[in-house]
C-alpha cells in the first residue's frame, strides 16, 4: 500500500534559516506559509540546484521541521543558509497514482482511462482544482 503524503496548492517557497549537515534530522526554515498542516509531506532543499535533495517532513514545531533525509532516491547532503526550499510532488506520487489508475480500470463502468480528465473542463467536473495542475508552472 502506498504511503499517504499531504499537499498544499498554496505553499510558498522559503529558504533555509541555518545550514544543515548531511546527518541532520531537523531544519529551520524562514517560513511555513501554506505548508500542509498534516504529515508527512515532501520538500526539495536546494530546489533546482545540482545539490537538490528531497526530504520528508514528519513533524514540525513552528519553522523547525523534523525530516527524513535523502528521500525518494536522493542523497543526504549538507545545505547552506539561504538554500531554496519548495513543497513538491515526488516521482513516487506519480507512480502511486498510475498504479491506482491501473487497479481501478473497469471500475464503475470506466473502460478507457486514457480518455479520462483530458481537459480543464473534465478536471473541474471531477472536482479537481485546475490550479492543482499548474502548481509550480
Regions found by a protein language model. Give the residues of each.
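Fibrous stalk/shaft segments of extracellular and virion attachment machinery
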Residues: 68-75, 79, 86-137
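Autoprocessing Asn-cyclization modules and mimics
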Residues: 1-69, 74, 99
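Short, low-complexity, polar/charged sequence segments that are solvent-exposed and flexible
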Residues: 46-48, 84-88
